[in-house]
Curated annotation (Swiss-Prot):
Keywords: Calcium channel impairing toxin, Disulfide bond, Ion channel impairing toxin, Neurotoxin, Potassium channel impairing toxin, Secreted, Signal, Toxin. Expressed by the venom gland. GO terms for molecular function: calcium channel regulator activity; potassium channel regulator activity; toxin activity. Contains 8 disulfide bonds. Pfam families: CAP. This is Cysteine-rich venom protein VAR1. It comes from Varanus acanthurus. The keyword Cell inner membrane does not apply. Residues 41-81 form the SCP domain. Blocks ryanodine receptors, and potassium channels. Belongs to the CRISP family. It is found in: Secreted. Residues 1-22 form the signal peptide. Coiled coil: none annotated.
Length: 100
């Protein structure tokens, strides 16, 4: 279910940014470097508009290890409970989780 929400969100973003109303599934694949760049650029654009502005907001970039971890987490997602922090730690850094 969470993957469906993710794909629908990505489809809406990509549809708006490309100015098209028809997309193939291949146009949404996050394994495509062009799609990765489009997602990252849109995310960084949105982050720049926060008010008040962040004092030390770093530019976000694509990370294949984190992307793969997020994919695994989404596949085993239980929307009623959070994943333990140990399951959301990559390279010693904890990753956030949002369940809605």
């Amino acid at each position: 279910m969470i993957l469906l929400k993710l794909y629908l969100t990505l489809a809406a973003i990509l549809c708006q940014s490309r100015g098209t109303t028809s997309l193939d599934l291949d146009d949404l694949m996050t394994t495509n470097p062009e799609i990765q760049n489009e997602i990252i650029n849109k995310h960084n654009d949105l982050r720049r508009t926060v008010d008040p502005p962040a004092k030390n907001m770093l530019k976000m970039s694509w990370d294949n290890i984190i992307a793969e971890s997020a994919k695994r987490a989404a596949l085993r997602c239980n929307q009623n409970e959070h994943t333990p922090v140990s399951g959301r730690t990559i390279g010693g850094c904890g990753c956030a989780e949002k369940i809605t």
